[in-house]
Each structure stands twice: as C-alpha cells, then as structure tokens.
C-alpha cells in the first residue's frame, strides 16, 4: 500500500471516529436540554412546585460542574473511549429511569445519572480530536465540535417538544434513552484508537493533585477565565434549559411552535458568532476582557428591554433577546483562552476544568433562585403570571453584577502580573487611537501625511502582529 493510500485510510478512520464522537456529544446536549421543554408536563406528572422542577436541572448541572476536574484526571488515566462509552450508557439508563418514574425522588436520581454521563462526553471528544488530527486542524475541529453540539438543542426544541405534546411522558423519554443506547453502540464500534492510559496521573499522590488545582486557581488569569465563563453563558443556559419555554408559553402566551422556534435562534447565532469571536480574540488578545464585558452588557440590555416592556413583550423582542444572550455562548470560550494563556501545559487541563465550572455554577444558582421566586408568586393552582416570571428573571442582574465586578478585579490583578513581567497594557483609548491610525495609514498609503506612530516597545504599530491584551 502506498503512503498516499495509508494517509487516505488514516484520514477516513479519523473521520469515522470523530463522527461517532460528535454523535455522542450531540446526544449529550440533547439529554442536557430535553428537560427544558418538559417543565410543565413534569410539574403535572410529579405534582411538583416550580422550585422542585428547577431542582431537576440544578441537580444535573451540579453533578456536571462537580465532575469537570475529576473527568480531566480520568481522561489521562483511562483514555477517552472508555469514558464516552460509560457516559452514553449512564445517560441511557438515566433517561429510561426518568421515563418510568412517577415520583419526585426517583426522577431526581435519574437526572443525577444523566448529568454524570453528560459530564464525561465533551472533554473526551476534544481529547480525541487532539489525537486524531494534525495540530493545524485541531483548532478548527474544536470549534466545529462546539457548533455541531447545538444540533442536540435543536432536537430538544423541535422534534422532542412535538413528540412530548403528541405522545406520553414514558414514550417520549424512552426515545431519548434509545438515542443514548445508539450512541453507546456507535462509540463501541467506531470511537477507537489513540487511548493512552496515562502513567503520569498514577504517579500523582492526592496531595499533588490538590496542589495542582490550588496552583491553577492562584493565578489571577485562571480566575479571570472562571469569572468570564461565569458571566457570559448563564442567561442563555437558564433560558434554553429550563425557564425560557414556560416563560414564553405561560407568561407570554406564545404557541408551542413559536416558543420552540425561539429556542432554535440560539443555534443559528452560535454558528455565526463563534467564528467572529474567534477572529476577534486571535486579532486582539490583550482586549479579550472587553469582548467579555460587551457580551454581558448586551445580554443585560436585552433583558432590560423585555422586562421593562409594558405587559407581554412582542415576539420580535424575544427574538432580539435570543440573539443577544446567545452571543454569550461563544463569548464564554474566551475563558478557556485565558486558561491556556496563563497556565503551563502541565496544569492546563486543571485550569480548563476550573474555568468550565464557572458557567454551570452561575446557571444552576440562577435556575434554583428563579424557582424559589416563582413559588413566592404562585397563584395557588400551579400557574405563574407574567409578572412572576419577570421578577424571577430580574435575579440575573445580581449574577451579572457579581461577575462583572470579579472580572474587573481579576483583570487588574492579571495586568499587574503582566507588568511585573515587562508587558504594559495601554489604555483602551490609546489602543483605539492606534487602530484608527493604522486604518488611515492603509487608506492613504505610506507617502501621504506623517509617518505612523511608533509604539513604546519600538515596534511599528502597523505591524500585523496583534499587540492588544486582556
């Protein structure tokens, strides 16, 4: 067999393996978000209050967030294939249990299994991407993985919501369980090759692992990444996973079809915003926090419009809301870039796990507190008014305030660390003025007007190398 044939065969095998992995991730997102369109039927089936229903998603996210750092360790020790198989099986068992559960406690335990299985998938698929593809392709494949995962949310918002309205609870969630079984079978058959049972983790004592976690958290750049992930995606996560659907169908009196359509906007926005955000981050790495704060500001502004609107907001305001809060998804990926920038490779996995916890902690706090607020305004018949939903969603401003304050605080600390290392970040107005000078220089040419200014480092600021930071 020629070298070209070998490369073609390897490439084909890599794509088959990746397809099996991405299907498992799509199923994981489907499992994660399916309960968001089932909040009202769940309240009827389990005779549950709003805070009880919120606890389903809160428990799942709590398990997911709590497992992120341990999952990173297990990937190094056992390899991604075993963990993806385990994760898909756990999700299938959890959904099957939920399908037949008739009481609150068994249903909550089922969600624990689903959350545990979900927690094993994404990081494993990313690890496999690094093993299967060349270094040149890994960044693009990582971005593709995140975007394709949104198909799982589409499955929840449209076909599963329709199925839940036409079939029974047991039948609907049995279908979700069947997807988990299919993902497990495909993983066993095709998700192969490259597993490395890591000896490094076996050589680490528990105290060493604890010190590694502490070292990663101690750097303000890691904390900046944590609070970035805390403040950007929680609003769209809360809306799409739990309270958005009942808010639209019960509070705003939208039809189920219109509410499902609104939830799909997140997918379209992510597909568009992700490459744009990646371009901005790579071009202006020292202004990443400005992008993060802009994402938070856009989300808060959109919610201000919806909550301040007299009576029920028209559909166009909810569509605009979905566009602006969905930008927070790609914006949250900036947090992982902070982790990569400010941590050595020896603890990058730990730092990434810490950052990934932030968004889910913010989301589960918001979901649970919103459930408590809705219970306060409950009308005695399990129904919630538009005003009750508005008061509940207003809690998000508390989360944005905390997140923005901590971002600014840790950004200042990170800049002091950079200053001690000899890197001085100029004020934003200076960077904008320098960018304007570059633009004018390109338009007028080198012979028109005065020569472009020279940066304090002695380098011409018209050079292509990006010089913005944080």
Q: Over which residues does each language-model region extend?
A:
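Cytoplasmic helix-loop-helix junction between adjacent transmembrane helices
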Residues: 110-149
